[in-house]
């Protein structure tokens, strides 16, 4: 449950 959060953050920041 750490990659999903990272992917979401990256997509939101990008």
From Swiss-Prot:
<dbReference type="GO" id="GO:0006952">
    <property type="term" value="P:defense response"/>
</dbReference>
<dbReference type="InterPro" id="IPR000874">
    <property type="entry name" value="Bombesin"/>
</dbReference>
<keyword id="KW-0027">Amidation</keyword>
<comment type="similarity">
    <text>Belongs to the bombesin/neuromedin-B/ranatensin family.</text>
</comment>
<keyword id="KW-0878">Amphibian defense peptide</keyword>
<keyword id="KW-0964">Secreted</keyword>
<feature type="modified residue" description="Pyrrolidone carboxylic acid">
    <location>
        <position position="1"/>
    </location>
</feature>
<keyword id="KW-0873">Pyrrolidone carboxylic acid</keyword>
<dbReference type="Pfam" id="PF02044">
    <property type="entry name" value="Bombesin"/>
</dbReference>
<protein>
    <recommendedName>
        <fullName>Alytesin</fullName>
    </recommendedName>
</protein>
<dbReference type="GO" id="GO:0005576">
    <property type="term" value="C:extracellular region"/>
</dbReference>
<dbReference type="GO" id="GO:0007218">
    <property type="term" value="P:neuropeptide signaling pathway"/>
</dbReference>
<feature type="modified residue" description="Methionine amide">
    <location>
        <position position="14"/>
    </location>
</feature>
């Amino acid at each position: 449950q750490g990659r999903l959060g990272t992917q979401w953050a990256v997509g939101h920041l990008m």
